[in-house]
Amino acid sequence: MTVPKSSPGPRSLTNRPSSAAEWWRQFLFGPPIPTHEQEQTRLPKLLALPVFSSDAISSVAYATQEILLALGAAGLAAAAHRAAYTRATWEVVGAICVLLLIVALSYRQTIFAYPSGGGSYIVSKDNLGVGFGLVAAAALLIDYVLTVAVSIASGVQNLLSTPAAAALAHQPVGVCLLFVALLMFANMRGLKESGVVFAGPTYLFILLAAVTVALGLLGPRLGWQLHPNAVNQTLPAGYAAAGSALGLFVILRAFANGCSAMTGTEAISNGIPAFRRPECANAATTLTWMALILGTLFVGISWLATSLHVVYWEKNGQTAPAVIDQLSGAVFGRTGPWVWLYYAMQIATAAILVLAANTSFADFPRLSSILAHDRFLPRQFANRGDRLVFTNGIVLLGLFAGVLIVIFRGNVDRLIPLYALGVFTAFTLSQAGMVVHWRRERGPGWLLKAVVNGIGALATAVVFAVIAIEKGPEGAWIVGVVAILMIVLFRAIHRYYVRLAQELRLDGEAPALQTPMQNTVLVLVGGVHRGIVPALRYARALTPRFQAVYVEIEPERTPIMEANWQRLFPEVPLVVLESPYRSLVGPLLDYIEQVKGKGPDDMVTVVIPEYFTDDWWDALLHNTAGPLLKLALLGRADVAVVNVRYHIHPAPAPAPSEQVRR
């Protein structure tokens, strides 16, 4: 029989809170959204850009800085080698832009080839095998956790460096955890609502960064006065021997550092189902926007930094001012009528660094759901919550990022060595997988597409190798160990689900439902009162032949109990179980073994009366024997436990004078 679907009624009628806890939950996270409204929660391109691209776009705040740091460590930032310093910077920036173009084209092709999302995991699994797919999945999940930790820690570091936050400067962990909680809260309200919240800061950063670059490069020709005293142009004494280490490895190291600009570029290909229809076209357009914005700002900031001869260094925990700080100070001034734009740029930079973590909150749960569908993670991660988001994945990501922040005390410099290794692992596997895909499909233009992806795979593999060699001793080896453990866990979960499916599979003819079985029904009673009546009625509905069981904890009460029972329920047999050690569970388990039938399918049903009160604190005044007994019987496949509730409506207590008269 098929039950016809009822038409969805007004949300106010179907989602009315049934309790105070439910009211607060809906107040904080919003009312549940029915499945048929899922399309309305999908993202238009203008909201999808900040949700999925804030990680990539925010990286321009430190990508150029990381390049200058690597070149400065080789002494190229010295005044005598300024031409080589500028030339090397542009060689690295140009190489990264070419790599960004290749990766963006690759993922644009991936979007149309794999419209269900999944990105590197799906591509690697389908074309290179399940093992490589799990490597990509583990790398991405680790990178998403690190993105949250690094982005929030970096943003908090920027915020706490301002004079207004001096009191919190030495307490970054609490502030970081607060931002993690806020991001969890925003994303649990729904992807569309989080996009609305985060769109403002993302677009503000893009606007202010573009204004800074434009005024810095073109402003002097139009009469705009720069403030070169805000720029650091020197290295500290003894920092490096000038020009001593110019070579291929220095360039590769600067290239690897600068490739932090590419973290997050795979996010859109993972989140295709979150886009409005047509999903693939909208996702591809958003990816193009992201690559253009990222590339333009990256080139512009690098151009302005080299034209102003910005130098960045780090020594013994001390650093030069951040490159973004130097550039905005040089363009707007740290004093004067435009100083508010300088502070606005610092706030916008800190905000987008914090919000960069939101990309992970969009993609980590979605990738987890795909892994759960493939039976490599628990099935709970495939379920959407009331707000049509993957709540379990959001919570797990927040917990892992919070633990990481606590372990590393919110220190960005200690977190950075772990970063980017995972994402370049995923890049390499994804693009290698696409090469196999094009060779197998051999559609129009397949050779050119395969060449593009092959070049991208080679380039990202080189970056991966450089990062692994350079940052491995600094802690990146931890990422490899964790990834191996995750893959072992994925395999173990998958084996369990395969065994479970084999156990539950129905082969051949449909099983007979009329096989003989004996069901012995026992009603556990602790006294003769109105609270046991619903349980007795329920037991009679199961079978007219059932027993009431009383465990004798206080022997002196037994005669009264038996007399009252015979007077009120003479037709129901009462079994009294002695319990010399005052145990409720032990005697009952022994009796179950006595009365259980001998057949393999025979069952014993234990019916437990339970009180249900209007106020939660009233429940604390009642015996908890029922839950303890249910826990003791939990592992018994031949015993079913049923709780039958009696709703208590306590009458108002009589006045003291009435109690005296009685």
Across the structure, where does each feature detected by a protein language model lie?
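Cytosolic C-terminal regulatory domains/tails of membrane transporters and channels
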Residues: 1-38, 499-662
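Membrane-interface "cap" regions at the ends of multi-pass membrane proteins
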Residues: 2-63, 74-77, 105, 116, ...
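Extracellular loop-to-transmembrane helix junctions
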Residues: 65-125, 129-134, 139, 150-179, ...
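Loop-to-transmembrane helix boundary motifs in multi-pass membrane proteins
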Residues: 130, 169-177, 274-296, 372-406, ...
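Helix-loop-helix junctions that connect adjacent transmembrane segments
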Residues: 203, 210-261, 470, 474, ...
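Hydrophobic alpha-helical segments and their helix-loop junctions in multi-pass secondary transporters
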Residues: 205-235, 302-310, 430-443, 492-501
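Extracellular/periplasmic helix-exit of transmembrane alpha-helices
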Residues: 216-227, 285-325
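C-terminal membrane-solvent junction of multi-pass transporters and transport-like membrane proteins
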Residues: 234, 380-391, 427-472, 503, ...
